[in-house]
Amino acid sequence: MIKDVIKKSEEKMNKTINSLNSELATMKAGRANPTMLDRIQVEYYGSMCPLNQVANVSSPEPRLLVITPWEKPMLKEIEKAILKSDLGINPNNDGTIIRLLVPELTEETRKNLVKNVKKVGEQAKVAIRSIRKDANDKVKNFKKEGTITEDEMKKGEDDIQKVTDKFVKEIDTIVAAKEKEIMSI
């Protein structure tokens, strides 16, 4: 019973880590990375689609992204979506492809990015702690129902805390690595 609760909690915590990694991948660190564009939605025949479903995105140079739409009329829509996004990069449309030159990050921009990284990391920690609380509540309910003893409840809570600590430490490591990546010139 308790093992199932811990296993489900670990699965949820892993999803939180995956979500953190995905979100941090979209944060530009002065290098062009196609994942920077993952959150951009483009209007495609009346409905919104992710950019990577209407175009090929490549990074031929460290600071350059090239977007090649599968249909030429999509150039304007892609350009419009990039301009509306929070990327802060101006697209260069040459009629067949769109080039995005990722600017060098200024010291101030780097510091703001690091603040955002810390904020996202803190949100992930809050999510992990929320999962821990839910797991502890389930274990306490088992005790109330009389299906486990007081000692089993305490051991279960300790095990849940160990799992939580492991994931919080992993978040700290991921955030520190991203900060280092952003601050390195």
From Swiss-Prot:
The keyword Cytoplasm applies. GO terms for molecular function: ribosomal large subunit binding. Belongs to the RRF family. InterPro entries: Ribosome_recyc_fac, Ribosome_recyc_fac_dom, RRF_sf. Transmembrane segments: none annotated. It is found in: Cytoplasm. The gene is frr. CDD domains: RRF. It holds the Pfam family RRF. GO terms for cellular component: cytoplasm. This is Ribosome-recycling factor. One of its GO terms (biological process) is translational termination. Its main location: cytoplasm. Responsible for the release of ribosomes from messenger RNA at the termination of protein biosynthesis. May increase the efficiency of translation by recycling ribosomes from one round of translation to another. Keywords: Cytoplasm, Protein biosynthesis.
